[in-house]
Each structure stands twice: as structure tokens, then as C-alpha cells.
């Protein structure tokens, strides 16, 4: 579960390496976010020459969490790290590549471009 001030690794080649959560979108007073939820974040670390610069405020979708997510069949999916992909307002990724596996829950939330770019969908 991701909340305000949580730091996440960026799983794309947009130029950002690490982001810090500012706000969880979707309802007033919402405290936590899980896989497939959109957050507003600021870039804390960035690579030189990238599309995204340090200090920039961006929207991102969570693709991996340590706490994991429960599925309809009763199984759980957990990952080794918390990671997100930086997106535009139309839910398309700002980068052109996705690194590492992503959860199947993204398909249910209509992030089709991220699912198609990902090397593995779990």
C-alpha cells in the first residue's frame, strides 16, 4: 500500500529514477493506493538528458507493490519493490519502454499501452 510521502522506483525510461508520492487520486480523503491506482508525485532522482527532470510534478500509475494485492480467486501477488510508471493525462506512458513485470490488475484499469510494453504480465 502506497501513501503520502512513499518513495517508489520508476519502471520506465522516462528519465526519472525515483518519485515521492504527493497525493493519492480517486476520492476525497483517500489515504492509500494499490496496484493500478493513479498518484501525483514529484521526481526525486532523474537521469541526465531524460524527458522528466528532477523536481517536476507528474502523474504515475502503480505497477508493483511489496504489500501486494488480493485477486478474485483468493490468491495474492507480491513483488520485491514498489514501482510506478509515469503517465500522461490520457493514461499513456511518458516513456517508450517498461522495465520488469507488471500486475494483471493494470489490464482491468485500462492501462493497455503499459501492459503491451511490459516484458511480463503476472
Curated annotation (Swiss-Prot):
InterPro entries: Ribosomal_uL14, Ribosomal_uL14_bac-type, Ribosomal_uL14_CS, Ribosomal_uL14_sf
GO molecular function, one term: structural constituent of ribosome
Record carries keyword rRNA-binding: yes
UniProt keyword terms in alphabetical order: Ribonucleoprotein, Ribosomal protein, RNA-binding, rRNA-binding
Protein name: Large ribosomal subunit protein uL14
Family membership: Belongs to the universal ribosomal protein uL14 family.
Species this chain originates from: Enterococcus faecalis (strain ATCC 700802 / V583)
Binding partners and assembly: Part of the 50S ribosomal subunit. Forms a cluster with proteins L3 and L19. In the 70S ribosome, L14 and L19 interact and together make contacts with the 16S rRNA in bridges B5 and B8.
Organism superkingdom: Bacteria
GO (cellular component) term, any one: cytosolic large ribosomal subunit
Role of this protein: Binds to 23S rRNA. Forms part of two intersubunit bridges in the 70S ribosome.
Amino acid at each position: 500500500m502506497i501513501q503520502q510521502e512513499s518513495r517508489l522506483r520508476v519502471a520506465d525510461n522516462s528519465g526519472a529514477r525515483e518519485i515521492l508520492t504527493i497525493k493519492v487520486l480517486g476520492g476525497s480523503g483517500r489515504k492509500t493506493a494499490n496496484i493500478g491506482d493513479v498518484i501525483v508525485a514529484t521526481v526525486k532522482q532523474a537521469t541526465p538528458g531524460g524527458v522528466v527532470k528532477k523536481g517536476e510534478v507528474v502523474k504515475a500509475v502503480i505497477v508493483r507493490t511489496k504489500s501486494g494485492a488480493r485477486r478474485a480467486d483468493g490468491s495474492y501477488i507480491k513483488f520485491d519493490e514498489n514501482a510506478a510508471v509515469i503517465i500522461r493525462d490520457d493514461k499513456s506512458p511518458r516513456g517508450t519502454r517498461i522495465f520488469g513485470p507488471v500486475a494483471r490488475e493494470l489490464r482491468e484499469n485500462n492501462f493497455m499501452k503499459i501492459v503491451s510494453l511490459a516484458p511480463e504480465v503476472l
